[in-house]
A protein has these predicted regions:
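STAS-like cytosolic regulatory interaction modules
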Residues: 1-50, 61-99
Length: 99
């Protein structure tokens, strides 16, 4: 789900449930599309209950695309399981993570 914010500068992409090998490609497609259309993409992870390495891969690819496009990717509302995974892998230092 996407919500436009302000003057078409940013968009919120809401993820929910499990982000895994089956669902990560869809998340990546949505983030890639949003990053080509907006200067800032906020990924709301508050509804995510599980994430595996495929989900992390989608986040890293989106971050790399954001850098190439001159856009900003922000992760917001990540719960315990996602925060733990980001910290264990060190990605919390490479991705913009907000409460």
């Amino acid at each position: 789900m996407r919500d436009d914010q302000g003057q078409h500068e940013s968009v919120v992409v809401r993820a929910c449930g499990e982000i895994d090998l089956d669902t990560a490609p869809g998340l990546h497609r949505e983030l890639a599309r949003a990053l080509t259309e907006r200067r800032e993409v906020v990924l709301d992870l508050s509804g995510v209950t599980f994430m595996d390495c495929a989900g992390l891969g989608a986040l890293v690819r989106a971050r790399n695309q954001a850098e190439r496009c001159g856009a900003r990717l922000v992760l917001r509302g990540a719960g315990g399981c996602v925060v733990r995974l980001l910290r264990l892998t060190g990605l919390h230092r490479r991705l913009t993570v907000e409460p």
